[in-house]
């Protein structure tokens, strides 16, 4: 990998990329409020579950969309996007995916200036597609020539860091703890990338009941710091 590709991966994979990720907790807020997550070990377990679920759903969408971009199959990109959106059962998850996806597209047209990204944002604004974050990420990175494996790694990193960053503000956990968790999950992320690279939207699955139960709890929560 050349330096140019690496810096682009670092830029667009940055946890402080201005797409609004800081407003979401990926479900960990409710998990902490209900006591499911209460220490470093349970936080690590929650992140692991989220990464596995992301690989078998959003990650496959990333790969399917990336392959469609490479094949210049724009209908395929839209199919992958709706497949991701339709498997998000709770409203908060759909809100997170589409809001961040649109923000990424809006930012990227000013940074990358690629006709495919402009087309993609137009499809989102016209309601022709949902504009989910995983598929938008695939479109933006594939347009820059970044490989599908690297984009899946970016997505997995984003899922983990969204949860860990939120946990820092919600429970007694240190920066050292969260970085150690992320480092320990490296081998698992490698396996999850293999799952995602199946890339078949017909095999996508979002079945993790605890996530939807926690989302329902979050909607009715009296105090909420995050949007999901």
Swiss-Prot record:
Q: Is RNA-binding set as a keyword in this record?
A: no
Question: Which keywords, in A-to-Z order, does the entry hold?
Answer: Chaperone, Cytoplasm, Nickel insertion
Q: Where in the cell is it found?
A: Cytoplasm
Cysteine disulfide partners in this protein: none
> Known Pfam families for this protein?
UreF
Task: Write out the GO MF terms.
Answer: nickel cation binding
What domain of life does the UniProt record list for this protein's source?
A: Bacteria
Please give an example of a GO cellular component term from this record. cytoplasm
Assembly notes: UreD, UreF and UreG form a complex that acts as a GTP-hydrolysis-dependent molecular chaperone, activating the urease apoprotein by helping to assemble the nickel containing metallocenter of UreC. The UreE protein probably delivers the nickel.
- Spell out the family assignment given in the record's similarity comment: Belongs to the UreF family.
Job of this protein: Required for maturation of urease via the functional incorporation of the urease nickel metallocenter.
Name the chain's protein: Urease accessory protein UreF
Species of origin: Yersinia pseudotuberculosis serotype O:3 (strain YPIII)
The top of its lineage is: Bacteria, Pseudomonadati, Pseudomonadota, Gammaproteobacteria, Enterobacterales
Query: Which gene name belongs to this protein?
Result: ureF
């Amino acid at each position: 990998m050349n330096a140019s590709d690496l810096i682009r991966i670092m830029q667009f994979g940055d946890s402080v990329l201005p797409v609004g990720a800081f407003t979401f907790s990926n479900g960990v807020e409710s998990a902490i409020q209900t006591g499911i997550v209460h220490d470093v070990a349970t936080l690590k377990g929650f992140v692991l579950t989220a990464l596995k679920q992301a690989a078998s759903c959003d990650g496959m969408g990333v790969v399917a969309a990336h392959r469609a971009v490479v094949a210049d199959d724009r209908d395929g990109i839209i199919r992958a996007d709706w497949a991701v959106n339709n498997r998000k059962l709770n409203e908060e998850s759909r809100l997170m995916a589409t809001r961040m996806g649109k923000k990424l597209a809006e930012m990227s047209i000013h940074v990358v200036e690629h006709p495919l990204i402009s087309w993609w944002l137009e499809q989102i604004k016209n309601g022709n597609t949902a504009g989910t974050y995983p598929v938008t990420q695939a479109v933006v990175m594939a347009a820059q020539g970044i490989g599908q494996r690297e984009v899946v790694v970016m997505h997995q990193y984003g899922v983990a860091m969204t949860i860990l960053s939120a946990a820092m503000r919600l429970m007694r956990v240190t920066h050292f703890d969260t970085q150690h968790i992320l480092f320990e999950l490296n081998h698992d992320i490698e396996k999850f990338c293999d799952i995602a690279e199946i890339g078949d939207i017909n095999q996508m699955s979002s079945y993790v009941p605890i996530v939807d139960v926690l989302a329902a709890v979050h909607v009715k929560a009296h105090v909420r710091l995050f949007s999901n």
